[in-house]
Amino acid sequence: KELYSLILFSGTDPDPRNRDTSRQRPFIDSEFFNFSYGRAEDGDRVIDAQYATSTRYVSTTMHGNATMFGVNFADGRIKVYPIGRDPRGRTKTFCVLYVRGNPDYGKNDFVGNGDGTVTDRATGLTWMKVDSAGLKAGPRGDGTLNWEEALEWAENLEYAGHADWRLPNAKELQS
């Protein structure tokens, strides 16, 4: 969650075959953090700008390799990456940003509120325990909503004595 917290959702997704990055915007604030796209002269694609985390994935991927979570600031995705060899047989290398400070950052601290909601004391966010299907939300009454319907439903929702519900943003949903 630490590395994910640095993602800017205003980046542009590059064409991995295009070598010109002059009109691209990375998904990290390059005013504060050094960033470079993958370099063709190193045998990389433009999108080869994966940053490693210390969080291992519980299973394996790509030819049974052990895997860890990472963030790609070239294309704005959180992914799992093989630890060891890449699909081309090369030792997989990553960019790394080191962090210090609160080791409990990103750890949820849930408490049930007894009213069908849960508060995460770490973030201050209150979540509903049930999803839209449990509420029979939407025009079809089955909980399936398109994005516009979901926004409108949240705007008019009264639940557990509160009328200020909204859709979470991407970082809140990841929290």
Placement of each model-derived feature along the sequence:
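Glycine-aromatic-enriched surface loops/turns that form tight recognition elements
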Residues: 2-166, 171-175
